[in-house]
Regions:
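Amphipathic alpha-helical transducer elements in NTP-driven molecular machines
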Residues: 15, 19-26, 49-52, 67, ...
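Short Lys/Arg-enriched alpha/beta "domain-start" segment
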Residues: 220-270
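Short, surface-exposed beta-strand/loop "edge" segments at domain boundaries and coil↔beta transitions
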Residues: 7-8, 142-145, 185, 251-263, ...
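Conserved segment of the helicase C-terminal RecA-like domain
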Residues: 1-43
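Terminal, basic amphipathic appendages of nucleotide-handling enzymes
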Residues: 2, 131, 169-241, 295-358
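C-terminal accessory/connector segments of nucleic-acid motor ATPases
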Residues: 36-162, 168, 243-258, 270-281
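Conserved, well-folded catalytic cores of nucleic-acid-processing
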Residues: 2-5, 28-35, 58-62, 77, ...
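A generic structural motif
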Residues: 109, 173-178, 277-298
Length: 358
């Protein structure tokens, strides 16, 4: 591994002085050396995008099928073990509505005209998400292009400035944005390159332990020693919540991407009002009126509740995540994200484990 980083500025806040990429690289190497561990596949998602692909390709290869015959061929595939017949019925009705599937006079199903256009594209059988370019516009000005745009409310850097995303038009591949001040935080919400919680926990251990790693070069050893000193003084390696002065706080949850994303949404949607929380953003300090004890009490109380995962989807949000999500009903896209992508159970376990800090 080669990690490049800019020298932290003298007035940089504590979280930005820790070499996160270096810690991640160490964690990956150590997990393999110590446990022969590699990140496991995610087999319990709700892959509605892949379900669309398999449905259309099955009809294209076999010809007319009854709904029952189609369900028997597709839903019995092991990867779809969490998808119910009711969900499949919702998908089929939607595909008929948008003409990707057509109903014959005998009640059978065949590929529709719109579906034919998708199938005849040579890229159809590549089921993984491509890097498709989106045009970024602000009012009448075209700013440039990006790939994999973040959802509304997140920030992007383009044309030498920072912009907040107002709307994403997935059909026209256009992002509408408004210029704001500030820098762009590291965004990793809706990208496929997720990080497992086990990696983050090993990163924390690397920050706290005094072990030397023989594969590190001189500069890396020096940066690691500096980071360990910073963590020891600040408590970053042992305390999840640290006050940076006044009402400015930083939270170190040490969670993987999708448990982290669930925690961020829980705080914004369910806890922000009671905690006086504002400015919560990945990799940036946030502002909170409540004290440390209240923070953990409120978070644990919300984590204990038996809420519907769909409550962690923002109002009006349709979190397109996979290649063919745009052809899936919005209700299934939201359900697939809330119940199949967000690691709510991992988030709850971590939130409840912080009770002792309250």
């Amino acid at each position: 591994f080669v990690m490049r980083e800019e020298e932290p500025e003298p007035r940089t806040m504590m979280p930005e002085t820790i070499p996160w990429k270096l810690l991640q690289g160490i964690a990956l190497v150590q997990l393999y050396r110590e446990e022969k561990w590699v990140e496991p596949p995610e087999l319990d998602r709700l892959p509605y995008s892949l379900l669309y692909h398999q449905t259309i390709s099955t009809l294209a290869s076999t010809g007319e099928l009854t709904p029952a015959e189609l369900a028997q061929r597709v839903l019995t595939l092991s990867y779809f073990h969490r998808i119910s017949a009711d969900d499949y019925r919702v998908l089929l009705r939607h595909l008929i509505k948008i003409d990707h599937i057509q109903v014959t006079e005998g009640g059978g199903l065949i590929v529709g005209l719109a579906g034919e256009r998708i199938i005849n594209n040579f890229k159809f059988y590549a089921v993984f998400q491509e890097n498709e370019e989106f045009t970024v516009r602000s009012e009448s000005a075209e700013l440039g292009t990006i790939v994999n745009p973040p959802p509304p409310g997140e920030r992007i850097a383009i044309a030498g400035h920072c912009w907040i995303v107002e709307e994403v038009d997935w059909k026209r591949h256009t992002v509408f944005a408004t210029q704001v001040k500030g820098r762009v935080p590291a965004y990793f919400g809706d990208c496929p390159g997720d990080i497992n919680t086990h990696v983050l926990e090993r990163m924390r251990k690397a920050l706290n332990e005094h072990a030397a790693y023989p594969y590190l070069m001189g500069n890396a050893r020096a940066r690691l020693a500096q980071a360990r000193h910073t963590a020891e003084i600040s408590g970053a390696g042992t305390k999840p919540l640290i006050n940076l002065g006044g009402d400015t706080w930083v939270l170190f949850p040490w969670l993987g991407s999708y448990a982290f994303l669930a925690l961020e949404r829980m705080l914004k949607i369910k806890c922000a009002a009671e905690l006086g929380l504002r400015g919560l953003d990945p990799s940036r300090p946030y502002f909170m009126k409540a004290d440390e004890e209240t923070f953990f009490e409120v978070l644990a109380a919300e984590a204990e509740k038996d809420f519907d995962p769909i409550e962690l989807v923002y109002p009006g949000e349709v979190p397109y995540f996979d290649r063919y999500d745009e052809f899936v009903p919005e209700e299934l896209v939201c359900k697939g994200f809330a119940e199949g992508v967000l690691d709510i159970e991992g988030m709850k376990q971590r939130a409840l484990s912080w009770r002792d800090h309250a």
